[in-house]
Structures are given as C-alpha cells and as structure tokens.
Amino acid sequence: MPSSMSGYIPSYLDKDELCVVCGDKATGYHYRCITCEGCKGFFRRTIQKNLHPSYSCKYEGKCVIDKVTRNQCQECRFKKCIAVGMATDLVLDDNKRLAKRKLIEENREKRRKDEIQKSLVQKPEPTQEEWELIQVVTEAHVATNAQGSHWKQKRKFLPEDIGQAPIVNAPEGGKVDLEAFSQFTKIITPAITRVVDFAKKLPMFCELPCEDQIILLKGCCMEIMSLRAAVRYDPESETLTLNGEMAVTRGQLKNGGLGVVSDAIFDLGVSLSSFSLDDTEVALLQAVLLMSSDRPGLASVERIEKCQEGFLLAFEHYINYRKHNIAHFWPKLLMKVTDLRMIGACHASRFLHMKVECPTELFPPLFLEVFED
C-alpha cells in the first residue's frame, strides 16, 4: 500500500504516528495496536482464513519488516504483528462480523428513534387554558359550517351547461357568465351570514368596538369563505362545494365571476387535500384570519394582535398534539394563511371589475355591504 495513502485519521493519533509493524503512516488502533491499513488487513485475513500455518520464511525467520519489505515475507510480517501485541482474539469471523455490524446498525437506529422521540417530547401541547380556547373556536366553526361532515351527501352539482357560455366580457381576459353568477349570488348571502355568526360566537371578537368588528369581518369574509370551500375539494369530481351545498368545477367558478381567483381557490383546495385538516384546525385557521391586526382603519390594533397571538400559540400546540406525518407541517400550514390573504386581496380587485361588468340588481345587498369600501 502506498505510503501517501489518505483517509480518515482519528483525532487521538499524533499527526505523524507510524505503524508499529512496518513503519508506514498509521491510521488508528487496530486489534490493540497502532497500525496502518495494510497491516490491519493482512493480520485480519491471516486469522480469518487461518493462513499462518502455510506461511514460510526463506531466510530462517530473520527478515526486517518495513513498508518496502512487508509484502516479501508473510511469516516474518505475521510474527512481528504478534510480537508488537496485535490480538488474534479480536479478529471476528464472518458470522461475528455480520452480527457486530447488525448490532451497530440497530444501535444507530435506536439512537435515531430516541432523538425523534425526544424532539416530540420537547414540543409542547395545549395547556388547559388553550384547550378551553380551542373548544370555543371549534364549536363556533361546527355550529356555522353548512352541512358539517355530511357535505358530500348533501351537495348538488351545478349543471354542466351553466358556466360554459360566457356572455359578458370582463377585463383581464376573464369572462362572466351571468347565469352562473346569479346561481352563486343565491348562496353568497347565507355563506357570508355564517362567517359573521362564526365571529360572533367568539367572546374576544364580541368585546371589540363595533367599528373594529366591521373592519375585521369585511377583511376576512372572502378569506374564510374560500377556506371553507377549499377544504371541501373533491379530487374525484375535481369540484369545490360552496356553502356546503353547491359543487362547482374550476371553469364554472371562473366564468361565474371569480376569474383568476377561482384558480387560486382550487389550487389551495388541491394542496390542502393532503393535509387532512380536522374541524379544529380549520376553525383555528379562521380565527387567525379573523383576528388580523393589519386591516386598515382598526383602532384596537394591540388588543387584536394579542388575540391572534393567543390563537396562533394554541394552534401550534394543537398541531403538536395531532402529530401529523407531514414534515414541517406547522410552517407549511401557516403559509396557507398567506395564500388566503392573497385570495382576499385578489377578490377585492376582481369585485371592482364585477361591479362594472354585471347588472347591479344581481348583487345581493349583504354582498355589496361586505365587499364595497
């Protein structure tokens, strides 16, 4: 083996430590002696294959072993290995070596599992106070979420011929199908009412000044309605169910007035379908959206911010409690809040175009009240 051999050198060795058998550069303790890789391998093979009885020296066992001559006489090399203290009992046969390797792997796997378990233990779960908050929010959502878990049985599909015939040209290359638009306006009032009812079931919301309540509701209404639709995405039919009753395709929602906003809501639905959110997680997402202290015109900014922080902390602890099998679940879920805020902003812009393109009499009063500035 060339003396310039490079590789891992243990920290316990001096920089220029030499092999006690041949004088080559040592790589560590092997079979109780400091040796090079070459002498380690030679000694191991000799013992494992019981080769030493076949070794014979041409010079009466008097060879000088160094890194040049070590391969010329196996008997003298082996004798020197024994003389310097290399231990034959430490050389494992194939079965023992496999058993040792298996044990090392098992210990490595056990350490890995212990580390995972330790990291899970270190993630706090909800306190008693947080559980009470979570219960209030969950009950508020369940009480105001149309059709609850039975939405698939209760939904009705919007006929395929509706939303396929664009009549009015809208800006940005979008189309508004007035028949589809009028269908959507029939369910928009109860959908908005349910969002308002959700908010009013939260004591911390009801304690805010009336003006702030209105600003918060106007700000979050489209975001919460979009979330409620997105979590009712059905991959089989590729539809969203609006207000727990009307199943629509991407094209129908787009042509019915939402334009590009439709794509954003559907994409969110596709993404959330792998998250398997329960009612509590949807409820807490809604509470976080509702209590957004950055809505323009708010008076009680600090108070609202503190409320949202309380929801976020309880939410994070609840996620720890749920133990989802998705890596980095919590930050990924928080990014959905950003997506929903973006949907709300895009809809505000889209609403202005709809006002221009669609007859005023088609807009329900509550729809105008919430989305007009």
Curated annotation (Swiss-Prot):
Domain NR LBD, chain residue ranges per copy: 129-373
Expression induction: By thyroid hormone.
Compartmental location: Nucleus
Keywords from the UniProt entry: DNA-binding, Metal-binding, Nucleus, Receptor, Transcription, Transcription regulation, Zinc, Zinc-finger
InterPro entries: NHR-like_dom_sf, Nucl_hrmn_rcpt_lig-bd, Nuclear_hormone_rcpt_NR1, Nuclear_hrmn_rcpt, ThyrH_rcpt, Znf_hrmn_rcpt, Znf_NHR/GATA
Keyword Transcription: yes
UniProt comment concerning the protein's domains: Composed of three domains: a modulating N-terminal domain, a DNA-binding domain and a C-terminal ligand-binding domain.
Function, as annotated: High affinity receptor for triiodothyronine (T3).
Assigned protein family: Belongs to the nuclear hormone receptor family. NR1 subfamily.
Protein name: Thyroid hormone receptor beta-A
Organism: Xenopus laevis (African clawed frog)
Upper lineage: Eukaryota, Metazoa, Chordata, Craniata, Vertebrata
